[in-house]
From Swiss-Prot:
UniProt organism field: Homo sapiens
Gene field: OR2L3
Family in the record: Belongs to the G-protein coupled receptor 1 family.
UniProt-recorded name of the protein: Olfactory receptor 2L3
Gene3D superfamilies: Rhodopsin 7-helix transmembrane proteins
Domain of life of the organism encoding this protein: Eukaryota
Glycosylation sites: 5, 88
Entry-linked InterPro entries: GPCR_Rhodpsn, GPCR_Rhodpsn_7TM, Olfact_rcpt
Keyword annotations of the record: Cell membrane, Disulfide bond, G-protein coupled receptor, Glycoprotein, Membrane, Olfaction, Receptor, Sensory transduction, Transducer, Transmembrane, Transmembrane helix
């Protein structure tokens, strides 16, 4: 029996799990994915921190991606699981605002960080002699800090808006987290101006970075094609294909969800797509980056040997 215990300012998250065996199966699957994401991303962060061979700009950026993914999935899944287990789907007005802020901030930061990672590979392959200068430690810190700051400013603007608009009597959000577009549908006012702002924000944080990434890899693939070393060509192709896989998994569902007009959107479809970028992508990223990556596997072997020999 579901217990909402709703006050006048609470929201209700209708959730993702149906009240059936299918819902229980999906719950177990999501929790498993969550645990895999925690283990994978924590392992990647520790591995890059502990092994000096991975103290390069590429892996420094990768460690930040794992940190974002770790926080990203932790913002969504614990509340999602708690609602299913307790049957209490209510979330306070403030709690909804906090969840919405962190989701938007982390999502924006990750989109910009993926563009920074593409720039790193572009410089490494197309301008190898300039790489130590263009991708210095200071530049990496600026990229990461900039991603967090810009993502947070964007999230703050969206969160302040949804916390100050008047809501109708129904406060049931047809989603499993406080997604801003899902909250806006409950507003007792015309929100077409804001929907245009969401479109613009999505274009800035997703479309423009994706175009930049595509252009970077176009140049990279051209440079790789002219490489004389077969081994170097293979390594470059592997690195680029890995990053492009991650970019596709992250950007595609986001763009499809947020660039469509409200009239063409389905709450059920939005929730299914949201599972991809809130749970599956954070779980898959460390697997994709470590699979067939000799440097990561070599670092894992070295760190494991140090742990076993007690030299940590």
């Amino acid at each position: 029996m579901e217990n909402y215990n709703q006050t006048s300012t609470d929201f209700i998250l209708l959730g993702f799990f149906p009240p059936s065996r299918i819902g229980l199966f999906l719950f177990i699957l999501i929790v498993f994915i969550f645990l895999m994401a925690l283990i994978g991303n924590l392992s990647m962060i520790l591995l890059i921190f502990l092994d000096t061979h991975l103290h390069t700009p590429m892996y420094f950026l990768l460690s930040q991606l794992s940190l974002i993914d770790l926080n990203y999935i932790s913002t969504i899944v614990p509340k999602m699981a708690s609602d299913f287990l307790s049957g209490n789907k209510s979330i306070s007005f403030t709690g909804c605002g906090i969840q919405s802020f962190f989701f938007s901030a982390l999502g924006g930061a990750e989109a910009l960080l993926l563009a920074s990672m593409a720039y790193d590979r572009y410089i490494a392959i197309c301008f190898p002699l300039h790489y130590p200068i263009r991708m210095s430690k200071r530049m990496c810190v600026l990229m990461i800090t900039g991603s967090w700051i810009i993502g947070s400013i964007n999230a703050c603007a969206h969160t302040v808006y949804v916390l100050h608009i008047p809501y109708c009597q129904s406060r049931a959000i047809n989603h499993f987290f406080c997604d801003v577009p899902a909250m806006v549908t409950l507003a007792c006012m015309d929100t077409w101006v804001y929907e245009g702002t969401v479109f613009l924000s999505t274009t800035i944080f997703l479309v423009f970075p994706f175009i930049a990434i595509s252009c970077s890899y176009g140049r990279v693939l051209l440079a790789v094609y002219h490489m004389k070393s077969a081994e170097g060509r293979k390594k470059a192709y592997l690195t680029c294909s890995t990053h492009l896989t991650v970019v596709t998994f992250y950007y595609a569902p986001f763009v499809y969800t947020y660039l469509r007009p409200r009239s063409l959107r389905s709450p059920t479809e939005d929730k299914v797509l949201a599972v991809f970028y809130t749970t599956l992508t954070p779980m898959l990223n460390p697997i994709i980056y470590s699979l067939r990556n000799k440097e990561v596997m070599g670092a894992l072997t070295r760190v494991s040997q140090r742990i076993c020999s007690g030299k940590m």
